[in-house]
């Protein structure tokens, strides 16, 4: 049986990446620091995924195990030494924390003489995630390890898309996911092109697909959350049931469409249909997606290369409209949740500094005209 190592045994790891790896005949070693999840994986060796749609079908994922990377790093290194593929779904901010362990696993492959080509795919909500991870891993590799990695270890970027809401069940491994899923991998950085996963799309140039996803799904989802929160909605579905909010989301997506068409020459009709499907996904009545989950970490989401500021910058450069995105940024700056550290921190910054200084600090912008435009909406 083929073997995989997946970093991140959370809902997305189990409910998306794990499902695809299982369907492709892999044994999956889930690596995490959550003892409860790791214990359950080892005790049961399987878990169930429910597809949130009419009929609510279930998939049983088997041949799984768990490794606690904090308590047993040597087991992770051993797993990396023999594995056929490595994936992650841990969040962009956590990638640097697994770099040293990955490097040790790569060194172990080198010492063992394992020259089977291996690809490491960071399945995260970020542009260039796998290459970012590689830059972190390189910091811990020996000169020999660097040469070995350049020859045998690929870090192809990936774009992933599936809504997996925050949830709690008596069975800690059980996870509910939406029917839609998309996983796209760039081919030019593959070291093992013969290992092709079914239900995964492979593209020579991934950037258009990553931007289509991040600027459409992530921007649209976050727009639903921040405007929804402003109007008191508790779930994304509740937000979409407000015609005013839905209209604003559609206006944001229209601006995103104009950027994607101008930049990547996407077909207008196909992109309109893609955005229509996104709205339908947000309106899935079988998914309970809390506004608080989607809106969390607003400081990160207001970053220079993130889902709002980057498309706004690029639309401005192209002299295209971005008024509705600006309005959403205003709602994001106003978002507060006592359980979200970043939203509280944002409020504290706005209380002690000028709005302009906070905008510069959070967004990283130096375009004075754009900074002033954002300030007007806060």
UniProtKB/Swiss-Prot annotation:
Family in the record: Belongs to the mannitol dehydrogenase family.
Designated name of the protein: Mannitol-1-phosphate 5-dehydrogenase
Key word Oxidoreductase present: yes
PROSITE patterns: MANNITOL_DHGENASE
GO function term, MF aspect, one: mannitol-1-phosphate 5-dehydrogenase activity
Catalytic activity: D-mannitol 1-phosphate + NAD(+) = beta-D-fructose 6-phosphate + NADH + H(+)
Pfam name, any one: Mannitol_dh_C
One cellular-component annotation, GO: cytosol
Gene name per UniProt: mtlD
Annotated positions binding NAD(+): 4-15
PANTHER family named in the record: ALTRONATE OXIDOREDUCTASE-RELATED (PTHR30524:SF0), MANNITOL-1-PHOSPHATE 5-DEHYDROGENASE (PTHR30524)
Keyword Transport in record: no
Species per Swiss-Prot/TrEMBL record: Streptococcus pneumoniae (strain Hungary19A-6)
EC number: 1.1.1.17
Entry superkingdom: Bacteria
Record-linked InterPro entries: 6-PGluconate_DH-like_C_sf, 6PGD_dom2, Mannitol_1_phos_5_DH, Mannitol_DH, Mannitol_DH_C, Mannitol_DH_CS, Mannitol_DH_N, NAD(P)-bd_dom_sf
TM regions (residue ranges): none
Swiss-Prot/TrEMBL GO biological process terms: mannitol catabolic process
Keywords on record: NAD, Oxidoreductase
């Amino acid at each position: 049986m083929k073997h995989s190592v997946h970093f991140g045994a959370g809902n997305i790891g189990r409910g998306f990446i794990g499902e695809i790896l299982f369907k492709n005949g892999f044994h999956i070693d889930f690596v995490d620091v959550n003892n409860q999840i790791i214990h359950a994986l080892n005790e049961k060796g399987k878990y169930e995924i429910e597809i949130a749609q009419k009929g609510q079908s279930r998939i049983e994922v088997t041949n799984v195990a768990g490794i606690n990377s904090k308590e047993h790093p040597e087991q992770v290194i051993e797993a990396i030494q023999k594995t056929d593929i490595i994936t992650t779904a841990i969040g962009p901010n956590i990638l640097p924390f697994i770099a040293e362990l990955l490097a040790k696993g790569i060194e172990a492959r080198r010492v063992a003489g394992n020259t089977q080509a291996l690809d490491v795919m960071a399945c995260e909500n970020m542009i260039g995630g796998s290459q970012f991870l590689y830059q972190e891993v390189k910091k811990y590799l020996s000169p020999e390890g660097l040469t070995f990695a350049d020859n045998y270890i690929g870090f192809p970027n990936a774009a992933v898309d599936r809504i997996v809401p925050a949830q709690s069940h008596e069975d800690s491994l059980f996870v509910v996911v939406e029917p839609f899923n998309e996983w796209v991998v760039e081919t030019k950085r593959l070291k093992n092109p013969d290992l092709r996963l079914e239900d995964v799309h492979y593209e020579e140039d991934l950037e258009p697909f990553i931007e289509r996803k991040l600027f459409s799904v992530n921007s649209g989802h976050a727009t639903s959350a921040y405007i929804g929160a402003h109007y008191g909605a508790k779930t994304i579905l509740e937000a979409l049931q407000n015609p005013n909010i839905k209209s604003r989301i559609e206006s944001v997506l229209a601006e995103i469409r104009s950027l994607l068409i101008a930049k990547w020459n996407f077909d207008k009709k196909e992109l309109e249909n893609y955005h229509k499907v996104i709205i339908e996904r947000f309106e899935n009545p079988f998914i309970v997606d809390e506004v608080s989950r989607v809106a969390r970490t607003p400081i990160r989401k207001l970053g220079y290369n993130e889902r709002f500021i980057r498309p706004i910058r690029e639309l401005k450069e192209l002299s295209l409209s971005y008024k509705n995105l600006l309005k959403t940024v205003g709602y994001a700056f106003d978002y507060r949740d006592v359980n979200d550290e970043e939203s509280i921190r944002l409020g504290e910054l706005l209380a002690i500094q000028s709005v302009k200084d906070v905008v510069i600090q959070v967004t990283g912008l130096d375009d004075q005209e754009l900074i002033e435009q954002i300030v007007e909406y806060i």
